[in-house]
Amino acid sequence: MTLTQAEKAAVITIWTKVATQADAIGAESLERLFSSYPQTKTYFPHFDLSQGSTQLRGHGSKVMNAIGEAVKNIDDIRGALAKLSELHAYILRVDPVNFKLLCHCILCSVAARYPSDFTPEVHAAWDKFLSSVSSVLTEKYR
């Protein structure tokens, strides 16, 4: 899925705002994921999944760092996330559908934080970008 120059610009522009609150948005996105899709909790049996827990915030930070790497390497998301894709496919064995669910939760969290900036065009660009991220993370399953 190729992003246009305008879509890339929209993703990068919003990311500059998201980056300042990335850890909080990451934790919020995971909280949304676990409350909306409780079956996803099975991948974190060793985590304290209560709201605001250190482990939840830590993993949210890792998730958003990966999104930041994808933004930074928007022309080579595949290369930027290759090791993460292998980790989730071969070692953690996360069901690929969960990446789509998490990306949706990230989209909701970003939209909720920046409603005036999250125009329909920005929404479409971020949706396409996160779909690309999700697609890259599931490539190794094939």
Curated annotation (Swiss-Prot):
PROSITE patterns associated with the record: GLOBIN (PS01033)
Pfam family, one: Globin
Gene3D superfamilies the record matches: Globins
Gene Ontology biological process: hydrogen peroxide catabolic process
One Gene Ontology MF term: heme binding
Residues engaged in binding heme b: H59, H88
Location of the Globin domain: 2-142
Keywords: Heme, Iron, Metal-binding, Oxygen transport, Transport
InterPro entries assigned to the protein according to its UniProt record, in alphabetical order: Globin, Globin-like_sf, Globin/Proto, Hemoglobin_a-typ, Hemoglobin_oxygen_transport, Hemoglobin_pi
A GO-annotated cellular component: haptoglobin-hemoglobin complex
Family assignment from sequence similarity: Belongs to the globin family.
UniProt function note: The pi' chain is the counterpart of the alpha chain in the major early embryonic hemoglobin P.
The protein, known as: Hemoglobin subunit pi
